[in-house]
């Protein structure tokens, strides 16, 4: 190993390359997990305000992938791909997220943990690990935290109305 940080080497996980979002959701872990893994449910909430979503493929299993488009108000299409690494129903998803191209240098690791709370709610912790500090800082600079929080707000609304 070269010692250079990568998203594939867990020994290089570093907080300076990480974005963490947390949201307590008024839903069971099963319902939250289904919102992430059912293609119809996923597109009802995924993406920041003003974006729509279309799933082209969703195969949620280790080694599977989801390919989907996020479309902005002005019609700009952003292709996306999740490559699933770990799937533990109602508990955890680990995936690599990037554009729907092979060898995307901006691809980052996402870990979604679902923790049931004593009151029946679910705490969702979403951790993004970016390949470099610079890439993380660039994402923060264009609003990744705010847009991510908008997305989790849409998830909360979806779960209340589902």
Model-derived features: positions:
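Beta-strand/loop substructures that line and gate deep hydrophobic ligand-binding cavities in soluble
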Residues: 94, 99-149
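Hydrophobic/aromatic beta-strand elements that line small-molecule binding cavities or substrate pockets
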Residues: 23, 55-58, 80-86, 108-116
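Short, highly charged C-terminal tails/helix-capping segments
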Residues: 158-162
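Short beta-edge strand/loop motif at the mouth of beta-sheet-based domains
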Residues: 20-21, 40-77
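Intrinsic-disorder/low-complexity, polar/charged segments enriched in Ser/Thr/Lys/Arg/Asp/Glu/Gln
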Residues: 16-22, 29, 53, 65, ...
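A short, structured loop/turn motif at beta-sheet edges
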Residues: 29-30, 60-61, 85-92, 113-123
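Hydrophobic ligand-binding cavity/cleft-lining segments
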Residues: 1-52
């Amino acid at each position: 190993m070269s010692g250079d940080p990568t998203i594939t080497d867990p020994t290089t996980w570093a907080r300076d390359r990480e974005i963490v979002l947390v949201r307590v959701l008024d839903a069971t872990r099963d319902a939250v997990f289904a919102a992430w893994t059912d293609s119809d449910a996923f597109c009802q909430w995924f993406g920041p305000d003003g974006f729509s979503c279309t799933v082209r493929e969703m195969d949620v299993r280790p080694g599977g992938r989801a390919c989907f488009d996020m479309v902005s108000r002005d019609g700009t299409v952003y292709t996306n791909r999740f490559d699933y690494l770990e799937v533990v129903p109602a508990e955890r998803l680990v995936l690599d997220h990037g554009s729907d191209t092979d060898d995307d240098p901006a691809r980052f690791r996402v870990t979604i943990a679902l923790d049931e709370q004593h009151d029946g709610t679910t705490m969702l912790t979403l951790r993004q690990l970016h390949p470099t500090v610079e890439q993380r800082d660039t994402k923060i600079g264009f609003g990744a935290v705010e847009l991510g929080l908008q997305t989790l707000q849409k998830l909360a609304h979806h779960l209340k109305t589902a």
